[in-house]
Amino acid sequence: IKNSIVAGELYQLNFGRTWQGPLGEDPVNIFHRLAINNPAPFSGYIEAADLGLALASSSPEILLETKNGEVMTAPIKGTRPRGSDPDQESLLRRDLVHDKKERAEHRMLVDLERNDLGIVSKPGSVHQSRFDVEAYSNVQHLVSQVRGVLDDGKDGIDALQALFPGGSITGCPKTVVCAAIDELEQ
């Protein structure tokens, strides 16, 4: 990964690891605890007990919203903790907004998502409509909204195919990063 970054082949790669092992409790209880300790507007739980699999997800990020022929994604990149009081919260927020590295990474992600939506949107319709800090129970994030108008013959499924997987969970440029992740997972 580091060599690819130094060579300029990719700019950022978000790499996760798989964990397998005994939980010691029912996975749905873990999901309920996650929902209490890290409430997020987009959460989900799927269990296939016969396969021994469970998936719990909790995210504040909107990958895709479609409505009346318009598409929107709200990428998140840049994080600070919540403050212990309003003054500290404000200081941490200002630090996040003015951090050059965080802003550069966020801008890179917004550009990636603009490009992805551009694949399925009418020419000239894709634009960034919002840039702000959103506060959640434990952290605050830089969040933007990128919007477009679906091109003729395109629908939400086409938009999902263009955006998936989301740039905030892969990195940039997406095709190179996804190939690198595939190689690392072999």
State where each predicted segment sits.
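Extended alpha-helical targeting/anchoring segments
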Residues: 1-186
